[in-house]
Amino acid sequence: SYKLLGKVLQEAKRLNVSVALNPSFKHLSEGRRELIKSLKDISFLVVNEGEAATLTGISFKKEAAVFKRLDSLMPGIVAVTSGAKGVTVSDGRFVYKAGIFPEKNMVDRTGAGDAFGSGFVAGLLRTEEVCREKGTCDPKNIEYAIRLASANATANVERLGATEGLLTRSSFDTSKRFRVMKIT
């Protein structure tokens, strides 16, 4: 519930803890206004194109306007996934765009967005990136998080089920396949 989310965010703020949020379309459609109010306390937001459009009330065809609106609502990083087209990330100062890693054998897209979101947050945590204010992020850390997230999503769609293909830290670190990704 959004009442509980508000309490969690208050406590996180009191403890100086970063909060990542990946709301579902159902949560967005049921409590858009409440969620918008909560964004001021969110450090990392991960949504897909449709969720970003629902949240902002702006068609994702106007991508720059969507990011401008989201950046104005929250202090942290916004990542908008675009399925097989990749991701766009804004830290309020820079916008990063990346495609996906080539899939060896796509089996099941279930959980790909969640795999991306968890990989993205893991990448930020691993680099100790906080980004509590717009424009304070280290671009190298954002790019690392995008690469880890994309690798995690790619590995996940190559296995059946939502979690079977998730990468371990070791499998990401040792895989030559995921070392280079074009990020503009």
Residue spans for each PLM region:
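Ribokinase/PfkB-type carbohydrate-kinase core domain
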Residues: 1-44, 49-97, 128-129, 137, ...
